[in-house]
Curated annotation (Swiss-Prot):
This is Dual specificity mitogen-activated protein kinase kinase 1. It catalyses: L-seryl-[protein] + ATP = O-phospho-L-seryl-[protein] + ADP + H(+); L-threonyl-[protein] + ATP = O-phospho-L-threonyl-[protein] + ADP + H(+); L-tyrosyl-[protein] + ATP = O-phospho-L-tyrosyl-[protein] + ADP + H(+). Belongs to the protein kinase superfamily. STE Ser/Thr protein kinase family. MAP kinase kinase subfamily. MAPKK is itself dependent on Ser/Thr phosphorylation for activity catalyzed by MAP kinase kinase kinases (RAF or MEKK1). SUPFAM superfamilies: Protein kinase-like (PK-like). GO terms for molecular function: ATP binding; MAP kinase kinase activity; protein serine kinase activity; protein serine/threonine kinase activity; protein tyrosine kinase activity. The keyword Iron does not apply. The modification Phosphoserine is found at S211, S215. Dual specificity protein kinase which acts as an essential component of the MAP kinase signal transduction pathway. Binding of extracellular ligands such as growth factors, cytokines and hormones to their cell-surface receptors activates RAS and this initiates RAF1 activation. RAF1 then further activates the dual-specificity protein kinases MAP2K1/MEK1 and MAP2K2/MEK2. One of its GO terms (cellular component) is early endosome.
């Protein structure tokens, strides 16, 4: 069961009544986090803005555009008219009794306490007209699955910065809130033009997870072998999902079943040491619902979902091809994708891995790369190196 901090008293859904007293307590909590000056300023600015928001009501929002759908809900970019803030509003349609609905809203209040540079900011949650609304900070770069579509593949140096943010985000959720994410995948890693990388859509409400259990099927392809087998799973399961996501973003396609040497050559434009096609007996090359790869060589039908799940549980884990990626990156991913969760690296071990140490030391203009890749204007703030 998910451990939750007791919900704040008072059913004022957005917790505004106690907002003023909370700000000082929050600032105290921020001091405990190891933040640099810029991160601290940005979090404080977010919390100050949030104070102006007041109680969230359906009438106060104006729809701007749809940002995406999935995970049982639709996300819109909205304007919150009273405060003038741009937010992302996720709407989840649920046919549930009022008591359950109230419990979900209550459990979501924990999100008010999730304040970290690696976690998407939360404005509040409320219920109206058969839908639960979760209002979050708008991340103008979208999710990494959207970025991947534009980029084709994401460079190793960029994935180094992504790995740091995901590990730090998962560590924060675990250490400060005793929760695991449960749904790490490229579409739940959001980025923005300031170069920030944040996790969203983590399992904070046990009741919401239960109520949405039937709509979770599409996510299973990122689940760890132990989770697919229904055995006990922990934050180690999130590490598998992160490893799988990194391989996908590095090679430009969902990595199960693995590409053979012919497909790798088409991907990277040169002969690459891949597996000799072990899966020759099974003429399938794509995960369910995945478009045909743009390389054109792939005329095989997609794997059925049960075949895919069987593959994850029974076949060797995916890995990065040799000769294209650094050995530290390969080793990092291999340690995330060990099938036995007890042998898989944990968050502490990953944080001191050579790949992470190198990535931390590297000067990478993440914001510049993102903006040029997806065609966003970079904000002209002093947060970027001159001449970028």
């Amino acid at each position: 069961p998910i451990q939750l901090n007791p919900a704040p008293d008072g059913s004022a859904v957005n917790g505004t009544s106690s907002a003023e007293t909370n700000l000082e307590a929050l600032q105290k909590k921020l001091e405990e986090l190891e933040l640099d000056e810029q991160q601290r300023k940005r979090l404080e600015a977010f919390l100050t803005q949030k104070q102006k928001v007041g109680e969230l009501k359906d009438d106060d929002f104006e729809k701007i555009s749809e940002l995406g759908a999935g995970n049982g809900g639709v996300v819109f970019k909205v304007s919150h008219k009273p405060s003038g803030l741009i937010m992302a509003r996720k709407l989840i349609h649920l046919e549930i009794k009022p008591a359950i609905r109230n419990q979900i809203i209550r459990e979501l209040q924990v999100l008010h306490e999730c304040n970290s540079p690696y976690i998407v900011g939360f404005y509040g949650a409320f219920y109206s007209d058969g839908e639960i609304s979760i209002c979050m900070e708008h991340m103008d770069g979208g999710s990494l699955d959207q970025v991947l579509k534009k980029a084709g593949r994401i460079p190793e140096q960029i994935l180094g910065k992504v790995s740091i943010a995901v590990i730090k985000g998962l560590t924060y959720l675990r250490e400060k809130h005793k929760i695991m994410h449960r749904d790490v995948k490229p579409s739940n890693i959001l980025v923005n033009s300031r170069g920030e990388i944040k996790l969203c859509d983590f399992g904070v409400s046990g009741q919401l997870i239960d109520s949405m259990a039937n709509s979770f099927v599409g996510t299973r392809s990122y689940m760890s072998p132990e989770r697919l087998q229904g055995t006990h799973y922990s934050v180690q399961s999130d590490i598998w999902s992160m490893g799988l996501s990194l391989v996908e973003m590095a090679i430009g396609r969902y990595p199960i079943p693995p590409p053979d040497s012919k497909e790798l050559e088409l991907m990277f434009g040169c002969p690459v040491e891949g597996d000799s096609p072990v899966t020759e007996t099974s003429p399938r090359q794509r995960a369910p619902g995945r478009p045909m790869s743009s390389y054109g060589s792939d005329s095989r039908p997609p794997m059925a979902i049960f075949e895919l799940l069987d593959y994850i549980v029974n076949e060797p884990p995916p890995k990065l091809p040799n000769g294209v990626f650094g050995s530290e990156f390969q080793d990092f991913v291999n340690k995330c994708l060990i099938k036995n969760p007890a042998e898989r690296a944990d968050l502490k071990q990953l944080m001191i891995h050579a790949f992470i140490k190198r990535s931390e030391a590297e000067e990478v203009d993440f914001a510049g790369w993102l903006c040029s890749t997806i065609g966003l204007n970079q904000p002209s703030t002093p947060t970027h190196a001159a001449g970028v």
